[in-house]
Amino acid sequence: MWYSDLDSFEPAFALDVQLANGKAGKAVHSVSASGIWTRFRNRFIGDRAFYKMALSLVVPVIIQNTVTSFVNLLDNVMVGNLGTAHLSGVAIANHLMFVFNVTIFGALSGAGIYGAQFAGAKDWQRFRETLRFRLLVSVIITALAIFILTGWPVQLLSLYLQGEGDPADSAAMLNFGLQYLRIMLWGLLPFALSQSYSSALRDAGETVLPMRATLVAVFTNLVFNYVLIFGKLGLPALGVQGAALATVISRLAEFLVVAVVAHKNMDRFFFLNGLYRSLRIGRDLTKNIMLKGMPLLVNELLWSSGMVTMTQILSTKGLAVVGALNIAQTFTTLFGVFFFSFGTAVAIVTGQALGAGDGELAKAQVWKLMFFAVAVAGALGVLLSISADWITQIYRTEAEVRSLAAAFMRATALCMPFQAIANCAYFAIRSGGRTLLTMAFDSIYVWVFCVPYTYALVTFTALGIESIYPLSQLQHPLKAVISLVAVGSGIWARNLVGEKTESALTD
């Protein structure tokens, strides 16, 4: 159930309506235009101080994610210059990396819920324990991922190579994917540990250091990609293996920067004092994080596997679709970071407000951040749609692949405002610890609706991929409607670390 008290639900677009009954029993509606604007402005538009605060949180994340996505784009172009088989092989390997990355995000989210609220409550001892939890769970998940990816790499990669096309091309893609994947495994642990530190720092309100660490990583990745892929500075040309090695080096650099700099500034990040003095995490706190975090971990695992399953289903329409999806997703990610980054602001702002006991402030801020994100997403969607054909020309690949990629980008661009709504709603619901609701809203939606719907389009219709892909994107408007209802209910706005739960969080 999205909300438990219908009487308390106030629609986002409330109107000033006065009803007067005439002699004939007809209702006369008088709507004040100025009243509508006043309510709209109060609900969705903040003052200068609000936007200054929001941008101070969002801009470093936007810079971090934009630079990361831009360098990923350059990597993508470099690998694409080696050939379509190289590009597609790396793409399918990165689908598996995507599942790992998102699973790490989900594993850290449970601790992040409490971390943000402990930061709001200034309880730094238990905040430190949430960081210990993040580090331990990251190591465990990394070990499981390495076990799976070293045990069944061929079987997993082959799932994406079942579409129509030359068997020789399919074999080449598999070979390049295996070369890339085997080296990428060495970068899993540094990535997981750096995400543990960065997420804790962000929960404490520190977004600049994670941004700087990422900037170091992406520029390291860019330089080593150019040198190792093409064999510059006297080094051998390693192709896709060079791309993987560059990524591993960059992830190690990111971890070293964020960890070393943070520990050298413990006067600012005093919650790091005694971090490794013991591995103690309060029993009840561990239980609560697991209760809140396990649904998030399962959610992210199911969501990411659902997304790659949809990609696999679409890829059965032909090998050209694999390369086209990779190009399209690279650019939609680059454009999307501008509004997806608002999710970080929603998580921090609402989490700290809830931790400080101000649920009404948390509710008010979500609507303003969501409206801001939607406006940004709409503008970026128009820009992406206009530039899609030009963008694909930078790739040295077949005309069919470029044409499909442009069509995919235009379809995604139309749905960006809806994605922005769902993204902000996800982080708002998560900030209040409504993890089962988060799971229903996210991964269950993907598996109950999106995957079967995409499968039905591919299997039971005679439509081409040019029609199937836009139709598959209709998942986003429906999810946006669900998101508005969920956020409007206010059921998510809970203080998890206040006086009522304080005893439950201590040993």
Question: What do these predicted ranges mean?
Answer:
Residues 45-77, 81-82, 95-114, 142-146, ...:
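N-terminal transmembrane alpha-helices
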Residues 2-58, 115-187, 237-293, 350-415, ...:
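Short alpha-helical transmembrane segments in multi-pass integral membrane proteins
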Residues 66, 70-88, 157-171, 227-238, ...:
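Helix-terminus/linker motif at the lipid-water interface of multi-pass membrane proteins
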